[in-house]
């Protein structure tokens, strides 16, 4: 959530930042509410002063064993009623302000390229080179079904479209990928954490999924609970309404979870395979950092996510997203896009973002500095470390052999217990 003070003092700049996101937002109503709020607060303060003086006068008279005049008692009751009415109006206006601010996205960092959409993203670097095959490489779903390790028909029968059943060596490979990711990130200083898959509305609002993305979320019909779209939601919320000591930062967490999203590809090749499903597995990285170090923490987050891809021998590239492509809560995002030999293109496998104080303001997470005891909002960061299903798919496409078999990357073999999946 944005600081209303920033909007109040820099409304033209904030409006331009929204235009850079392809959003034409008028802040006139918000500023009117803000002005009205200030006026009401002033009235309440004056009325409280008046009430206090009248109460003191009543107290003085009673101390002198004198009966307070009926007019004075009536006046103090009248002031009390006016204060209560003004406080009700204040609550209504503050609710309007909060509802408005909850729907406004983060301001892009100055280093983010201004652009309309993904076509304006900036490629930062390539890591590794795609292998040239002596045969036409197949898509991962073709490979998986022929090997008997992916069963989309069974998943469709069980749940419907955009789900997958992994079997035999496929299940073992997925489990191996998850364990590999967790181990490698723990070696980098991340603390492993396991959280609930069901979270309340406050948690989803805190990270920015609600209210704007409610239609993309799976919600329980009876309880006011949501299936998590990413472990970012529960992990970031562990410090909601907390104050962290400066010496405790940065805090770095790694968490494996299943993820659930209603959105799904409706055209092209994304209607097949493991790229875009309602349920998928992901290892998530979350950081809590001091504002002055969050930019550095983002760069190291990108390196940590890329490290596991390099260890798996998967070629990828790092892309800086433009203002027209970054997510709602993000101030700056790098995508890691892995090479898919079957597709013949790079596809997103991780998004690493600096949210700055956007989530911290929604969740009231602060850092206390040791020198001056000052408390201020900290910065949160998160990134996939990385998407398990897409890694599974990338391994099938990049390590496929002409006979239909798939070689297991060297770094995974101690986790799988086998080095090849044969037809």
From Swiss-Prot:
Q: Which GO terms describe its molecular function?
A: ATP binding; serine-tRNA ligase activity
Q: Indicate the enzyme's highest-level EC class.
A: ligase
| InterPro entries in UniProt | aa-tRNA-synt_IIb, aa-tRNA-synth_II, aa-tRNA-synth_II/BPL/LPL, Ser-tRNA-ligase_type_1, Ser-tRNA-synth_1_N, SerRS_1_N_sf, SerRS_core, tRNA-bd_arm
What is one Gene Ontology biological process annotated in the Swiss-Prot or TrEMBL record? selenocysteine biosynthetic process
Q: What is its EC number?
A: 6.1.1.11
Residues that hold ATP according to the record: 261-263, 348-351
Q: Keywords for this entry? A: Aminoacyl-tRNA synthetase, ATP-binding, Cytoplasm, Ligase, Nucleotide-binding, Protein biosynthesis
- Asked if the Swiss-Prot or TrEMBL record annotates the protein with the keyword Cell membrane, the reply is no
Task: Tell me its family.
Answer: Belongs to the class-II aminoacyl-tRNA synthetase family. Type-1 seryl-tRNA synthetase subfamily.
> What PANTHER family does this protein map onto?
SERINE--TRNA LIGASE, SERYL-TRNA SYNTHETASE
What does the UniProt record say this protein does?
Catalyzes the attachment of serine to tRNA(Ser). Is also able to aminoacylate tRNA(Sec) with serine, to form the misacylated tRNA L-seryl-tRNA(Sec), which will be further converted into selenocysteinyl-tRNA(Sec).
State the name under which the record lists this protein: Serine--tRNA ligase
Q: Which organism is it from?
A: Endomicrobium trichonymphae
